[in-house]
C-alpha cells in the first residue's frame, strides 16, 4: 500500500463504494454485541470464581480496589477500568469486575462483526454473514468463558478487535497505534500484532502509528505511582528503572516460554488441536478455509491474518502454563473476517453455527449459580485464630484470601503471607510496610520467619481448597 491509498485494505480493488444503508451497517454490529452481552449477563458468575482459568481474579480485583500493581506487567489499564466498574451500585464487587469482562467481550464481538462487514461480495457488504461470524466468536467456548469472570483476556480481546477494525477499515494510524498500546498494557502477547499493524498501514504513516503506540503505552508510566499505595498487591519495585523494566517486560515469566518435553509435546498438540476444533465445532474451520480461498479479501490481508494467527498459536503452544490455551483468543478474532467470507456463500444458513454453539455450550458455561469459592475462603478465614499469620502455598490461595480480606473486609486482624512470594526481596519489603511488627523479613528464610514470629502470633499453614486445609501452631 502506498501513502496515497485511502481505501480500506481488506477490500478487493474496485469493490468499495459508499453504502447507502449506513444505519443498517451500524446496527448489525451493535445488535450482535448486544445479543452477546445478553447471553453473557444470563450466564455470568455472581461472585469470585476460579472457573475458566480465573484464579487470578482475586488478585486483579484487589489490586484495582486498593490501587496496587498486579502481577507482571502490572495491568494498569485493567486497574483503572476496574475502578470504574467498581462504582456500579449493585452486585458484589467481584460481579462488577465480571461485568467489566462481559462488556469487554461484547465490545470485541461488535467490532469483530464490524470488521467482518468490510468484506464485500459484488460490492455489497455481507451483513448477515458478518453477524453470524460475530456470534460464532461470541459463543466459542473459550471466548464465552472469559466473558463471565474477572480476568484480563476479555478486555485484551476488546482492544484487539478494535485494532483489527481500525486497521482493516482504513482508520487513523494514530488511533490504531493508541489501541495497540492499550492492548499491550492488558497483555504482553499483543506485541504479536505489531507486524500485522505495520503491514496493513502505509509506510509513510508509520511514524504517526508509532506515536499513537507510545501514547497507548502511557498507562505503564503510572505503575511507580501505584506502587506507593498501601495495597498488599504490589509486584516488584517499579520505583526504579530496573524494577520498572522487570515488571513491564514480564521477565518473571520468561522461563515459561520453552519447548515441551517429547512426551508432553504430543499431548499438548492434541489438546490445542481439539480445543481449537471445539471453538467452532469443527465445521466452522471449513468455512474459514472457504473464506481463505474465496478471494473476497486482498491476498496480503489474508496472509497477514493467517500468519499472525499462527504466531499466536505457536506462542500458546510453547508457553508452559495451565492457562496458556486462553492466549489463542486473538486467533479467533483474527480469523473472524475469514469465517465471514466463508459464510457469505450460504447466507442466512450461517446462523446455524452460532445457534449450535449457544445450545451446545450453554449448560457447561453457565456460571449463574457459581459461588463455590466464597464458603471455602470464609471457612479458612473465620476458623483462623485471632491475629494469626496465615501462610499460603501459592497464587490461588493468596489471591483469593486477598480479595476477601482487603476488598470485603473479612478478618482484617489476620496477616496474609505467601510462601512462594516470600523468596522475593520486594515482597518482604511490602510485608514490612504492611505489618511493621513482623520480624525475620530481612532474608529469604521462611523457617526463621516462623520461629521469629510464633511467640507473638499463631502461625497457620492454610490452603483454600475443597478440603479447606488449615494447620496452626500456637
Where does each model-flagged region fall?
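Aromatic- and kink-enriched transmembrane "portal" helix at the membrane-lumen/periplasm boundary
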Residues: 42-45, 79, 87, 91-98, ...
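Signature aromatic-anchored transmembrane alpha helix within multi-pass, membrane-resident enzymes
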Residues: 128-131, 214, 302, 341-361
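Membrane-interface alpha helices of multi-pass inner-membrane proteins
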Residues: 62-66, 133-135, 161, 173-187, ...
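Perimembrane helix-loop-helix junctions
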Residues: 3, 7, 169-171, 192-217
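Specific aromatic-rich, kink-prone transmembrane helix
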Residues: 65, 111-114, 139, 143, ...
